[in-house]
Curated annotation (Swiss-Prot):
Primary gene name: fusA
Record bears the keyword Protein biosynthesis: yes
Protein name: Elongation factor G
Source organism, top-level taxon: Bacteria
Pfam families: EFG_C, EFG_III, EFG_IV, GTP_EFTU, GTP_EFTU_D2
CDD domains: EF-G, EFG_III, EFG_mtEFG1_IV, EFG_mtEFG_C, EFG_mtEFG_II
Transmembrane segments: none
Disulfide bonds: none
Length: 694
């Protein structure tokens, strides 16, 4: 089976935005104009093609990143639609690994919002080129140039408008293409499929277009010496040369082309598709992926070529009600065929590939092979998100994905005892699908706790248990995922001796612990002269890690600790792994109590949009919640207030904000950092936890 298109004509793109910026609507229009759907699905009607889970249709938000292939002017676009809601940010992170370029959708009214900032930082981290699409130009308060300023100020990027709008709010008619200096005007009612292209630019828009064309040319020539010389010598620059230079500068992430439109009103989407082709990279335009050969330990590269050994990344795993487990994978090099045996390289496990599907939201087309650069889904592979798939004869392990830690937990139990086993199978399935969803058992109360990125995240998981698997559960109140850490160095000694007839137990370890900023835990072995035999040292490490699961302040997991084992002793006959594990735990607990232990809590970055008259009340309320106000700014008719607030104080905030502002304010929050809890509150938390467990 040949490639559908040459690799140079392939674009793997993500569509990313803050919730409600109109991202799913934009994706729907793209699918309509590329001929993938015959009827436009509106989000507010619950009919959007990409939002295929029941809960998405009800809530009008995108939860899982559906992927679909579409075709435009001889190019294949693999589009990944990602959620804008903060609780599902993990979907954005994992799809970044599969992408070569991103369309960032911004609302022309709200401009750059918190989740967009968070996603932009992730795109920086993964080095993904992007273009900006300013949507909702038909809305009251629409301001294309305000978004331009915001992108510079908040994202530290260099946007380059390649269009300017013709009109705005209810008078928004179309755009001026600054390369060709032509007006694109959408008038008819053919769902935006037809539009006029004319040299006749409205007289009130012409001076604005001329000014911004000059700015566009200046920004582009600054990235290209040859063009700069021509420009300074007064030579006319061809559109082709300018576009070529902008493509290069977009791929190198020096510039961000900026476009505008109204997806809902069917205006501006076709030029956006042209820009995806013109400026975003194909798989051969991005650097090769790097990984480690597990046999040699050497770093190796894989280029986007069918002739190199097969290498792919499983970037998403989902349970499918009809096909079983689906593994979405991005092929970086080589070719994979249905029936091939491949290696899950990070687990050194061979598996046979059965059926391969090309996905369109939740519909599928069976294909026989996938080539370098392409994205597809395999049925029934035993993988988890982040696994590397490779040619068994040329193994390579790609860098694994990092995901944010869950910040909220909730106790659950099945309503009927008979569902207990089924529930644990389903929870395991969910953990495979979603790396930010975790399940633990509280050692004190024996309760099952589910952990996630926010209340909505956990609500949807509970809803899925009932809908997809018929399991009804009782849920407890949401709890904050507190952590503990230490603030100074301390030494601890653990000696475990048991004599009870026959063989005894003997383990003795002395450790020093100290604060560690850059990671959660590090173990250093400084034993000399064999005072503890080598085979028992991992047991001390395991004992320390076990003790860290239940800290000394209030029994929460400890983070940010470096532990150095430097002394101890052993007994020729009685020493054992279990004795040293217990000694390690004892030594850690003794040291931790002396190391100025403190409680940490998740701090959220909260952004509230409120009419001006409620501003004082909203700020006062945030301060009462131990919030630190970072600032406020006027956006159209509303004020935007930014604050850092402990998550513990934000439960039920949506209801309180509604009553405070008569339902006129909205808010969003993103996890920011862990911070020390004030002593008086830490004492209350520790007391409440001890009481609950007694």
């Amino acid at each position: 089976m040949a490639r559908p298109v040459p690799i140079e004509k392939l674009r793997n793109i993500g569509i990313v935005a803050h919730i409600d910026a109109g991202k799913t609507t934009t994706t729907e229009r793209i699918l309509f104009y590329t001929g993938k759907t015959y009827k436009i699905g509106e989000v507010h009607e619950g009919a959007a093609t990409m939002d295929w889970m029941e809960q998405e249709k009800e809530r009008g938000i995108t939860i899982t990143s559906a992927t679909t292939a579409a075709y435009w002017k001889g190019y294949q676009l693999n589009i990944i639609d990602t959620p804008g809601h903060v609780d599902f940010g993990v979907e954005v992170v994992r799809s970044m690994k599969a992408l070569d370029g991103i369309v960032f959708v911004f609302s022309s009214v709200e401009a750059v919002q918190p989740q967009s900032e968070a996603n932009w930082r992730w795109a920086d981290k993964f080095g993904v080129p992007r273009i900006a699409f300013v949507n909702k130009m038909d809305r009251t308060g629409a301001d294309f140039f305000k978004v331009y300023d915001d992108i510079i100020e908040k994202l530290g990027a260099k946007p380059v408008p390649i269009q300017v709008p013709i009109g705005s709010e209810e008078n928004f008619e179309g755009i001026v293409d600054l390369f060709e200096m032509k007006a694109y005007i959408w008038r008819g009612d053919e769902l935006g499929a037809k539009y006029d292209v004319t040299d006749d630019i409205p007289s009130d828009v012409l001076p604005v277009a001329e000014e911004w064309r000059e700015k566009m040319i200046e920004a582009i020539v600054e990235t290209d010496e040859e063009l700069m010389e021509k420009y300074l010598e007064g030579e006319e620059l061809s559109v082709e040369d300018l576009k070529k230079a902008l493509r290069k500068a977009t791929i190198s992430r020096e510039l961000v082309p900026m476009l505008c439109g109204s997806a809902f009103k069917n205006k501006g989407v076709q030029p956006l598709l042209d820009a995806v082709i013109d400026f975003l990279p194909s798989p051969v335009d991005v650097p090769p992926v790097k990984g480690v050969n597990p046999d040699t330990g050497e770093e190796e590269e894989r280029h986007a070529s069918d002739n190199e050994p097969f290498c792919a990344l499983a970037f998403k795993v989902m349970a499918d009600p009809y096909a079983g487990q689906l593994t979405y994978f991005r092929v970086y090099s080589g070719v994979i065929k249905a029936g091939d045996t491949i290696l899950i390289a990070n687990k050194n496990k061979k598996v046979r590939v059965g059926r391969i599907l090309r996905m369109h939201a939740n519909q599928r087309e069976e294909i026989t092979e996938v080539h370098a650069g392409d994205i597809a889904a395999a049925v029934g592979l035993d993988t988890v998100t982040g696994d590397t798939l490779s040619d068994p004869n040329h193994p390579i392990v790609l860098e694994s994905m990092e995901f944010p830690e869950p910040v909220i937990a909730m106790a659950i139990e099945p309503k009927t005892k008979s569902d207990q086993e089924k529930l644990s199978q389903v929870l395991n399935k969910f953990m495979k699908e979603d790396p930010t969803f975790k399940v633990t058992v509280d050692p004190e109360t024996n309760q099952t706790l589910i952990h996630g990125m926010g209340e909505l995240h956990l609500e949807i998981m509970v809803d899925r248990m009932k809908r997809e698997y018929g399991i009804e559960v009782n849920v407890g109140k949401p709890q904050v995922a507190y952590k503990e850490t230490i603030k100074k160095k301390a030494v601890g000694e653990g000696k475990f001796i048991r004599q009870s007839g026959g063989r005894g137990q003997y383990g003795h370890a002395i450790i020093e612990i100290e604060p560690l900023a850059e990671k959660d835990y590090e173990f250093v072995d400084k034993i000399v002269g064999g005072v503890i035999p080598k085979e028992f040292i991992p047991a001390v490490d395991a004992g320390i890690q076990e003790a860290m699961q239940s800290g000394v302040v209030a029994g929460y997991p400890m983070i940010g600790v470096k532990a150095t084992l430097f002394d101890g002793s052993f007994h020729e006959v009685d020493s054992s792994e279990i004795a040293f594990k217990i000694a390690g735990s004892m030594a850690f607990r003794e040291a931790a109590k002396k190391a100025n232990p403190v409680l940490l809590e998740p701090i959220m970055l909260v952004e509230v949009d409120t009419p001006e008259e409620y501003m004082g009340d909203v700020m006062g309320d945030l301060s009462k919640r131990r919030g630190k106000i970072l600032g406020s700014e006027k956006k159209g008719t509303t004020m935007t207030i930014k604050a850092e607030v402990p998550l513990a104080e934000m439960f039920g905030y949506a209801t309180d904000l509604r009553s405070l502002t008569q339902g006129r304010a909205t808010f969003s929050m993103v996890f920011e950092k862990y911070e020390e809890v004030p002593k008086n509150i830490a004492d209350e938390i520790a007391g409440a936890k001890a009481k609950a467990e007694s």
